């Protein structure tokens, strides 16, 4: 669902790490074919890849359910910014988070977190604002 949304919003690409096979029929169905239209790369070492992007001038954020992280609505994003969305079970690893500026989606209700697809959608929308 994140890939489907990314492609629909015109996101430039995706860097995937520890994901299912993108050509798995269920994944292709969930993306509504977006995986065939969205440029992507597989990362073997996400923390190292993030370091490379940062050395090339990219700003890299990580979405975390942490009130001390920067409120996503207060960030002025640029077209070359990157945001890491962790998986629903473990979130963003400490090694990866150490390379990123943490951001959060402030929630008014009692939910502790959002699922990855919903969080990813909100993050992408805010980054394009």
Regions found by a protein language model. Give the residues of each.
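RNA substrate-binding interface of SAM-dependent RNA methyltransferases
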Residues: 1-68
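Short flexible/disordered coil segments
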Residues: 57, 77-85, 122-129
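Active-site/ligand-binding-proximal alpha/beta "capping" segment
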Residues: 61-112
């Amino acid at each position: 669902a994140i890939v489907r949304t990314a492609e629909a919003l015109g996101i430039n690409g995706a860097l995937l790490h520890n994901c299912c096979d993108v050509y798995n029929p269920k994944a292709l169905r969930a993306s509504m074919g977006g995986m065939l239209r969205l440029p992507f790369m597989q990362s073997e070492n996400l923390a190292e890849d993030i370091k490379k992007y940062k050395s090339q001038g990219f700003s890299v954020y990580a979405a975390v359910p942490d009130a001390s992280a920067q409120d996503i609505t207060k960030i002025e994003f640029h077209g070359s910014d990157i945001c890491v969305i962790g998986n629903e079970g473990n979130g963003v690893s400490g090694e990866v988070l150490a390379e990123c500026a943490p951001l959060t989606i402030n929630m008014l209700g009692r939910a502790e977190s959002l699922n990855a697809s919903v969080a990813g959608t909100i993050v992408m929308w805010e980054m394009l604002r």
